[in-house]
């Protein structure tokens, strides 16, 4: 099954079903699924599904092959209330639509709907909505989907030339991760800071750290971009630059400045109907710099992001913003990023502070927070300040942050310079006076209205990020947040919130990645003028997009280098470990302290082989990193003289397949080369196992003399243990001993 056959399966059987009585209705809570419905129509579980398809494939329809479902009899779901901005006064409980509740056919009429297609990090995807719950009004029953097998029917279309650029991210969202393939080659740039010439020096330490870690990073000034790229304004020029850079391997984008430095794009999702601010429907939207398909103004009317503008809402790069205007603010932001990643103290990183107030007299934000608690990584301890518990107010909230919390989640009202805390509120001076340093908040997430309105002079998010002695990093709304009256946890802002933390746990522990993935996941629900589309535009991340978050006190990485480093072209064997275990998928970077020389990711045994030219260098810096572990740095001296590296190796075994099976004997053949600048004499190779999975019966082999540039072989009899298994790494240590003279 998969892309080749077009046949796919969904399974909901493991989800917990909860029927909750509300008025004369039964609310159907089904695992982590969202509840959706048009106003007055049944409020039912819905799933969003993304399917990776080929670039020359165009979906036509859905063929249902098999359905497993449960019928919930004598169950009438409540009518959905209209979505409401968090400033709206509560309406009466919604009246049911008589055309649906008095009808005869199922609602919704279709089990699966195709919402469109788009490109996620270059991968073409089909966007589907699955109506997991369907109401049968004539029987007063709900049919609840348990499993589904279907075919995505499609036709051959013109190849649009799209190619996946980041399979790891795409695979976390699509139904068929096995069909995702990376076609694009890595370029010379993975991370970029876009800032002004006047602020570029302040961002240099951050870029230097990225290079030291092994990430190809640069600074691009808005002045340089404006002079070298076309566009109707600076925003479009920046976006056109990002388009070309994304095609060459760009992943991470830090917008290094407030709107006076890196201008924002205003997007239109819909009319909110709040009628409070004249610019309330003009959403400052950094998704414009992340979703790089099209122009966002297809009809060329100067209004960006309209449904008719063919915005696919799927990110192509990961974006964060540093809301800084001065050199001192930029330095403060950079210092906080470096401090959090490298020096965060222990004792608070597994602590989360959840605040929930009554959004109205019928809607308890604390209940919405309880849904999010279930999405947190194991071991995270949650402190709940809920208006329902009578323990939420401004003083307790600020005191708690100052005591040290890594994650903060706020479900409450807000405005440009207000963040509400039940009976009272927090104001700019409260954030400015925070004193939680060195225990910076890795992530503060709020669904409150306007707290991240970064197009205004200063908003609450900016005060938090730029607090001199504390604060941290922030995700919030640049305009209204949205809720569903009477149904806490099921408003669109709640749904984004919950899914965000789910992706944060399952992705690369990066807030920027989680925000990109939740926007991709919600795209099938956001293709119309609705509050889901609004959330796509309004949610903004103030932080470094590549910075990983901790969820516990981190173990420190250990970095081992086999042998000495010699001048010239050399292979450098590096092993990454934590505790007593190897670290797979860790990044090892080699630099001269300023410029990146080479980098690579470790295999299952924690091993990575770096190849670099060390000519003219006295020492190099090795850095090992992996999200969730504390990075390690080590300066290593570069020596003149011989340098022996393993060139090739293979196994000749009893059955001739080149793989050692459990209990099988064979010979390990090694080829070594002298890549240094002098000769070696009387070289002897010693091979030793590090565990019982492989035994070596004759552990030394006399290689002989090895002149500069020469290659020689060595052979070792080996036997595999009966305990050897596929996917279980084992390590052999090769030691080479020689003389520099005859």
Q: For each of these PLM feature ranges, what is it?
A:
Residues 554-561, 639-662:
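Low-complexity, acidic Ser/Thr/Pro/Gly-rich terminal tails and inter-domain linkers that flank the onset
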Residues 568-571, 662-669, 712-714, 728-730:
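Short, solvent-exposed loop/turn segments enriched in Ser/Thr/Gly
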Residues 624-640, 719-742:
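Terminal connector regions
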Residues 672-676:
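Asparagine-centered strand-capping/turn motif at beta-strand->loop junctions
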Residues 1-635:
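Cysteine-dependent hydrolase recognition
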Residues 582-584, 677-683:
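Short acidic/proline- and small/hydrophobic-mixed sequence motifs that coincide with surface turns
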Residues 615-619, 665, 725-731:
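Extracellular Ig-like/FN3 beta-sandwich strand-entry sites
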Residues 599-609, 695-724:
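Intrinsically disordered, low-complexity Pro/Gly/Ser/Thr-rich segments with frequent PxxP/GP/PP motifs
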């Amino acid at each position: 099954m998969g892309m080749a056959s077009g046949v796919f399966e969904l399974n909901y059987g493991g989800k917990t079903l909860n029927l909750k009585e509300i008025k004369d209705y039964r609310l159907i809570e089904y695992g982590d699924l969202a509840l959706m419905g048009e106003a007055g129509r049944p409020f039912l579980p819905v799933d969003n599904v993304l399917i990776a398809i080929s670039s020359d494939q165009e979906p036509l329809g859905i063929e249902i092959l098999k359905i497993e479902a449960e019928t919930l009899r004598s169950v009438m779901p409540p009518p959905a209330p209209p979505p409401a901005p968090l400033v709206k006064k509560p309406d009466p409980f919604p009246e049911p639509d008589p055309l649906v509740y008095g009808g005869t056919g199922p609602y919704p009429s279709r089990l699966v709907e195709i919402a469109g297609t788009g490109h996620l990090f270059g991968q073409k995807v089909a966007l589907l909505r699955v109506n997991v719950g369907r109401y049968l009004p004539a029987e007063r029953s709900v049919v609840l989907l348990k499993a589904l097998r279907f075919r995505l029917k499609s036709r051959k279309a013109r190849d649009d030339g799209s190619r996946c650029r980041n399979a790891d991210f795409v695979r976390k969202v699509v139904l068929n991760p096995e069909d995702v393939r990376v076609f694009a080659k890595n370029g010379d740039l993975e991370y970029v800071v876009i800032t002004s010439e006047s602020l570029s020096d302040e961002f240099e330490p951050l870029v230097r750290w990225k290079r030291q870690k092994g990430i190809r990073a640069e600074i691009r000034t808005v002045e340089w971009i404006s002079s070298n790229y076309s566009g109707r304004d600076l925003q479009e020029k920046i976006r056109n630059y990002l388009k070309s850079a994304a095609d060459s391997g760009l992943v991470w984008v830090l917008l290094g400045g407030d709107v006076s430095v890196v201008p924002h794009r205003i997007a239109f999702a819909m009319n909110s109907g709040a009628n409070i601010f004249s610019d309330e429907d003009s959403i400052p939207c950094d998704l414009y710099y992340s979703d790089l398909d099209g122009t966002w103004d297809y009809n060329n009317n100067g209004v960006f992001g309209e449904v008719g503008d063919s915005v696919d809402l799927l990110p192509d790069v990961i974006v964060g913003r540093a809301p800084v205007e001065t050199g001192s603010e930029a330095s403060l932001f950079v210092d906080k990023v470096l401090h959090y990643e490298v020096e965060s103290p222990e004792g608070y990183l597994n602590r989360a502070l959840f605040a929930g107030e009554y959004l109205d007299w019928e809607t308890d934000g604390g209940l919405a927070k309880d849904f999010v608690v279930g999405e947190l990584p194991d071991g995270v301890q949650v402190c709940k300040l809920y208006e329902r518990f009578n323990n939420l107010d401004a003083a307790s909230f600020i005191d708690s942050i100052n005591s040290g919390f890594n994650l903060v989640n706020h479900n409450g009202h807000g405005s440009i310079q207000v963040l509400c805390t039940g009976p009272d509120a927090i104001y700019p001076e409260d954030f400015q006076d925070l004193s939680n340093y060195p225990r910076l908040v890795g992530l503060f997430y709020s669904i409150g209205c306007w707290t991240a309105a970064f197009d205004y002079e200063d908003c609450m998010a900016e005060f938090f990020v730029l607090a001199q002695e504390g604060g941290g990093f922030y995700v919030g709304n640049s305009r209204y947040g949205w809720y569903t009256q009477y149904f806490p946890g099921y408003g669109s802002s709640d749904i984004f919130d919950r899914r965000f933390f789910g992706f944060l746990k399952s992705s690369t522990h990066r807030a920027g990645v989680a925000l990109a993935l939740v926007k991709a996941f919600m795209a099938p629900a956001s293709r119309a003028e609705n509050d889901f589309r609004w959330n796509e535009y309004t949610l903004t991340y103030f932080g470094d997009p590549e910075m990983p978050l901790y969820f516990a006190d981190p173990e420190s990485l250990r970095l081992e280098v086999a042998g000495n480093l010699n001048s010239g072209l050399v292979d450098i064997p590096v092993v990454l470990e934590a505790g007593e275990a190897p670290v797979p998928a860790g990044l090892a970077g080699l630099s001269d302290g300023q410029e990146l020389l080479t980098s690579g990711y470790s295999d299952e045994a924690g091993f990575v082989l770096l190849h670099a030219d060390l000519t003219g260098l006295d020492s190099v810096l090795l850095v090992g990193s992996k999200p969730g572990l504390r990075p390690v740095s080590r300066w290593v001296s570069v020596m003149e003289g011989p340098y022996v590296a393993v060139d090739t190796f293979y196994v000749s075994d009893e059955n001739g397949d080149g793989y050692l099976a459990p209990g099988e004997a064979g010979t390990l053949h090694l080829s070594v080369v002298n890549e240094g600048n002098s000769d070696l004499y009387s070289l002897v190779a010693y091979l030793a196992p590090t565990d019982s999975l492989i035994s070596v019966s004759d552990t030394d082999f006399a290689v002989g003399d090895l002149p500069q540039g020469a290659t020689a072989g060595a052979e070792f009899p080996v036997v595999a243990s009966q305990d050897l298994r596929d996917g279980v790494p084992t390590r052999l240590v090769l030691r080479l001993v020689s003389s520099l003279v005859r």
